[in-house]
């Protein structure tokens, strides 16, 4: 049957990508439907019970700055918070939290069920409704047909998923959930470029059988306890608990090696490529054969369960080997496994078949987000989901897409890497992937993105008010530091020595003093000449005050480096966003090598910037392209069948 209500946007899948996509589209005022195979698993943490980390925490902060749910849900469900790289520079500091699975999932579901313009429906999707080169809806397992103007597909590991434990395997999207076999077959019919990837998860352990007295305790940060959302409060956190650390040993490694003849990875049963930066314990032992021990973190799954997640032993070895290797580690000698670890193979679609908006090039109105694009991780999925939801919303409103730049957000780095370089293994975000990481810090994600989010319609009044107060306070106080001067007469030798280690010998601005090593903003405020009086409205908001102080201190101390990077960005921007005609005939570009013509024709970059990052495209090739465009020779090749529309301005 055809469902009587027509929607603007349909989101397929209720994981981290799907929930952010649905919420973003609905916040923009679009009539949005979220289709999920099981409403009880909305926002489920399928693997590790944690959010954030190096690079990943940056993405979560950006999602939050754009009004997303992940950071806020983590504040409500987080049972341990830490700042990683706290002793290093601000560019690489990152927030990480352990989350109670049940509380996190409840926080996400609460937001979905209370979001205006958003409807939920429980049914697996077996088919997409496509008319010509345009998607017009989705069909569920029992034949209910939902019409829409755009569809966001966030299928996770469910597309033709196959679960492996030893040499036993069965179809599944994750343990306990069915695979989306029919939908996968339908997507293959649409001739979208497809491949197979693999990921895995460790066995879960009953905490009652762990001897914690033999383990190293790892508490979270307590002074202060971090928050994830820019609107978060420590009071939102539930009870905080520690993690625990054990190690593999020579016996563990021997056990693993003895089981490799029954490993689906080492017997050729699994064909998909696994994540390089989250390897299975089999891979670790094989790749790092000389390493005598690997650190294993025992992470609590929640406050109302005894289940522990042993981070570091993801495996698809047979269950008897899993049990033996777990019990070979200190503190786990009598451990009981509650759930076996497993590997899962699944379909993904080459992200080079996407526009930078995450819309497929072949089918108008169809957007992909999350693991379907070859990424791994909750945070990468949430960021893509948010962007796909925003751009699906803009699409149905007949507006141009928003495609964040590499110098604007880690989200821009993520998407640009995917659509220009593709993936040969599951993609994970790191700070090292961002060439402008000093400008793309966790602390300034709101300064970079919240104003854009407000214009897009995804930032509400509460967030906008808090952001505006913070932005204005940072601006006023930074200016005061630059224009307030002290000299040997106004700054006593005692104060100067206490702050700087010696008296000053001539006039300095307070900003000059703050730039000195070891001098903090609080230290400057402790001077008689440096006393600052925060707005009365901010005086009782400790979290906002801490954010303001951090922004001021980083902005002043790193001003020279930030300005230098801004200059570099400006120079590179000259041609970064110069658009290429969608169907430019690269065989007509004089001087291009055969390889360059072949790759440009295959991947069809949208901009000069994207073209420059395709493997094998040299600076000389880019120069030839620019000359071709300036001569007005950007003639279009015959339009390929099924090509989508793109209303964005192009260089002609």
From Swiss-Prot:
It is found in: Cytoplasm. Its cofactor is FAD. The keyword Ribonucleoprotein does not apply. It comes from the Bacteria. FAD binds at residues 13-18. Belongs to the MnmG family. HAMAP family: MnmG_GidA. NAD-binding protein involved in the addition of a carboxymethylaminomethyl (cmnm) group at the wobble position (U34) of certain tRNAs, forming tRNA-cmnm(5)s(2)U34. This is tRNA uridine 5-carboxymethylaminomethyl modification enzyme MnmG. It comes from Paraburkholderia phymatum (strain DSM 17167 / CIP 108236 / LMG 21445 / STM815). The gene is mnmG.
